[in-house]
């Protein structure tokens, strides 16, 4: 008995995400919501669809994968552009099955668990697509969110035309997934920057040195910033301030450029004339501290499992313009220096040090591929909490349609 208890504890449960169409004709099952982009290759979307044989009789069942970029501004149509652009679309027929395909371990376990009316599908990402990223709207913003999202859709239809307007909504189900990048195994050189400024009526310059302990940090990890100020001037450095700045370049449509502080720390330690100070300021950039501000998030599945966007890694030779939004990070250290008239003429000087912010590699990738059907835990694939105006309108339309059917 004790051995059985110990065995059950050693084998973790595996959450399977499911979602069922309104008319119960199709139910889609996925083993994860996040798919890892390893730069040279991306994890495929493997899952199964359970069909009701009576409700899909005479119909075909398809599963599609769409990557779309939303610009987010309703007034963009004034200049003749759509504020949604599909970057990639792929579709496979799962019922009736077309040829025999090899099954993944997850699919084998799910088919064994769910029974004979379960059909596998496999959708792959090309290597040129961006990762999931979203410009978090400010509270006063309305309209579509700006960003890149990925949608998996399963639907049953008796029409040869599988266009969006031809698919019966009651027989379709949609899930938003994320494509994310994890930190590379090799780090870059330790970030370091030096700067000097010459001031009026001072013979010697003000020196600033900024260094980080490493080039790559994980989400939620404290970032110690070592600052050395060598003040050879006749002025006083009154304040030292360090910021983590998120740099987002929207390259697909407009080349908009956003620089937003996502973490700030400062010290009131003064550096008098002809003296030196070395201090360390620790910063922790978190999306939780930036909820009410416009900024960049990793995607919009749920509030609780979304981080600040990871730094973008681009495959060598790839066209940057199709990446949608390029994200990078930098540490900015800013000095406030006294002037001739005190506070009235104080000036600020600053320098930046780039670094990368990413997810760590999974601890044991092989363990994630082992499935035991008795350890499956099925969870409804709920829509994300961060809904934009279009999605709310769409859900309301679906509910109204259901009421009339």
Curated annotation (Swiss-Prot):
The modification Phosphothreonine is found at residue 233. One of its GO terms (molecular function) is G protein-coupled receptor binding. GO terms for biological process: G protein-coupled receptor internalization; signal transduction. Retina pigment epithelium. Gene3D superfamilies: 2.60.40.640, 2.60.40.840. It is found in: Cell projection, Cilium, Photoreceptor outer segment; Membrane. GO terms for cellular component: membrane; photoreceptor inner segment; photoreceptor outer segment. The C-terminus interferes with binding to non-phosphorylated RHO. Interaction with phosphorylated RHO triggers displacement of the C-terminus and leads to a conformation change that mediates high-affinity RHO binding. Monomer. Homodimer. Homotetramer. Interacts with RHO (via the phosphorylated C-terminus). This is S-arrestin. It comes from Sus scrofa. The gene is SAG.
